[in-house]
Amino acid sequence: LNYFSLNAEYRINKNFSARFGKGTTFIGNGYRSMLLSTNHTPYPYFTFITEFWKVKYYNHFTTFYDIYNSDISQKKHGAFHYLDYAVNNNLTIGLFEAIIWQSSDENFERGFDVHYLNPIIFYRPVEFSKHSPDNALIGLNIDYSFKAVNLYGQLLIDDLNINRYENTGDGFFQNKLAFQLGVKSQFSINEHKFNFLSEFNQAQPYTYAHKHPMQNYTHM
């Protein structure tokens, strides 16, 4: 049942649509994604999509299961915002944010936190106002195309402490970054069509992790 997927989409009108079911979602333009990928088993989700002018805006809500915990009653939830803006015919920029929190612990049954149903970017002020221990991440997605070539990249910030970075370097647990750089192209030679893709991905130590393991940005 872990690999079973079922997805549905309902278009309300030209500006609004909804997707829901059990599946996966991919954010990005490359082979992999440092923001949200499909490299895991399906999970329950609901996505509300708003489209207008040059903008696509996604509200994405999920239920995850911890990769190291075999007890499927131990759930965690995710709330995501992703804003995709087409600057022009060549350049698209996306802003990403996510909050991961555990459904319960030994003392408290929290469930899905309705504070994160806020449809407006940003989550960070909500988390701060609640004095929340949740796992917060932000990111950037860029795609630039010209002729038959696409240049793309991503940056994910899980945690960043500039003052400590100079003294402690990559291994400091409060400097958690991931990035992606890539290029892809389609071209023809003597009527034969070719696809080319080259991509580099890197994540700093402890990126996606959290001091409370159930709040790691992972799914089984």
Please place each PLM-identified region on the residue numbering.
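Well-ordered mid-protein domain cores that form the structural environment of catalytic cofactors
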Residues: 1-57
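Signature for the C-terminal beta-barrel architecture of outer-membrane proteins
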Residues: 15-17, 26, 45-220
